[in-house]
Amino acid sequence: IISDIHGNIHGLKTVLSDLTGVDKIICAGDITGFYPFINEVINTFKKNNVISVKGNHDQYLIDGKAQEDKSDEIKNSVERMKKLISEQNFSYIKNLPEFLNITIDNKKVLIVHGSPWNHFEERIYPDYPSFDRFKELDVDVVILGHTHYPLIKKIGNVTIVNPGSCGQPRDKNLLSYTIWDTKTDFFENRRLIWDIEGFIKEAKLMGVEDSLFEVFKRIQ
């Protein structure tokens, strides 16, 4: 389970190279946004048959602009993405669902970027004050993203999983993803060291502003 790649092909490849014996890859959105390697990321998704939903940044790309209250960094990244993305890959993003209800090994799974109640913008942090709301859902597992903070929490009969980010982790510098053994219902969050400096150097050559790398310095 992965999320919030944000055009970081270096992070995505690091995570994929760590996977062994995996049958499915699920993504909770934000394939695009911030960093410039969006075509490489989308092509990798296609090659690996990743099951994914849209995130808010993916929707900004589809809309051609971010909302007025968003930061200049986000608005600039939308303009950069519009110039970079291929026609085929734009169609791929446009055709992703806002949410998915699927069944895996007789378990009902909801995949959504933000929350079941606000698909794009609500953030379910580890200290979310209203976790009891999840008890009302007729599912076994909710997979979400958006916060860039990993979470594995069981509320009643519902397991809530946020894999963290393999593109822009915000709690520490290590990339984050989650393994789910669907036979035993065991979830494990994993963290990986990656080549931050190499990524920053290459992204800067593509015109990414320095402010988008501050997050990596802030959490060292």
Regions found by a protein language model. Name each.
Residues 69-76, 106-137:
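Active-site-proximal segments of metal-dependent phosphoesterases and phosphodiesterases across multiple
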Residues 6-11, 33-36, 59-62, 118-119, ...:
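Active-site environment of divalent metal-dependent phosphoester hydrolases
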Residues 26, 51-53, 110-112, 143, ...:
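Hydrophobic/aromatic beta-strand patches that form the interior of the parallel beta-sheet core
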Residues 154-220:
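Acidic, His/Gly-rich catalytic cores of divalent-metal-dependent hydrolytic chemistry
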Residues 1-6, 108-115, 160-164:
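Active-site-proximal beta-strand elements of phosphoester/diester hydrolases
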Residues 98-106, 153-155:
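Short acidic-hydrophobic surface loop/beta-edge motif
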Residues 124-161:
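Anionic-ligand binding region
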Residues 2-94:
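Core catalytic region of metal-dependent phosphoesterases/phosphodiesterases
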